[in-house]
Amino acid sequence: YESVWPFGWLGLLADTPPVNPELIYAHHERGFVLCSQRSLTRSRYYLQVPLSEKVEEWSDERFWTELKRRLPDELTNKLVTGHSLEKSIAPLRSYVVEPMQYGRLFLLGDAAHIVPPTGAKGLNLAASDVNYLWRILREYYHHGRIDLLASYSRLALDRVWKGERFSWFMTRLLHDFPQQSEFDRKMQAADRRYYLESRAGLTTIAENYVGLPMERVA
C-alpha cells in the first residue's frame, strides 16, 4: 500500500543556536515549516517545497529568507542564520507491506513501512517491530511457543497502521496542497484550531506523538 505526497521537505543543517528550545511545527500559506534543535549550537530547519524543486537552486540566503517569511515575527527576530553544513530535499511518501512476514522471514522498519516525517513515527515504529519480534522469539526459544511466530505480522501491523494514520493526519493538517480549494483551506484551519484549543484534541495529539501502548504477546 503506497501513497506519494505532492511535495517534499527541503532541509538545512547549520551550526547556529536554535530559534526555540522546543520543536516548532508551523503552517503557512507558502508551505509547512519545521524548526528543530540538534544541540545548543546546531539547528535543523525544513521547508515544504514542490517536488520539482532542485536543491542546487537553493542558496543559503534564499533558504533563510523563505524561512523568515513563514515564521511569525517573534521567532523571526530571534532567528540566527549562518552557513549551511548540509542541504537536501526529501520526498514524502506513505508505504506499508502486508503481511510483514513470509514463513520465518520477518520484515522490520523501513523494509516494511515508511511514513512521512511529520509525525516523527519512523524510528518509533521500527523500534516497535523489534520489540514485538524480540518478545515473540524469546517465548519461542525459552518456552517453545512456536504458535506465537505467526502472530508477529498481526501485532506489528496494528501499530504500524496507527502510526501511519497519525503521520497522514499531521501531514494533511499542516501542509499546503496543490489545487486546494478555499473550502479545503477553511476546513484545514478549523481542524488546526480545534486541536490547539480543545483539551480532547491536544490529548489526542499528545497520546499519538508520545506513542500508543504496546499489545501483550503472550
Task: Please report, for each region that a protein language model flagged, where it lies by residue.
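Short, cationic motifs built from Arg/Lys/His that form the positively charged side of catalytic pockets
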Residues: 56, 104, 156-157
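Short FAD-binding loop at a beta-strand-to-alpha-helix junction that anchors the flavin cofactor
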Residues: 99-117
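C-terminal structured domain segments across diverse proteins
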Residues: 105-110, 124-125, 133
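C-terminal helical "tail/cap" subdomain of flavin- and related membrane-associated enzymes
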Residues: 118-120, 135-218
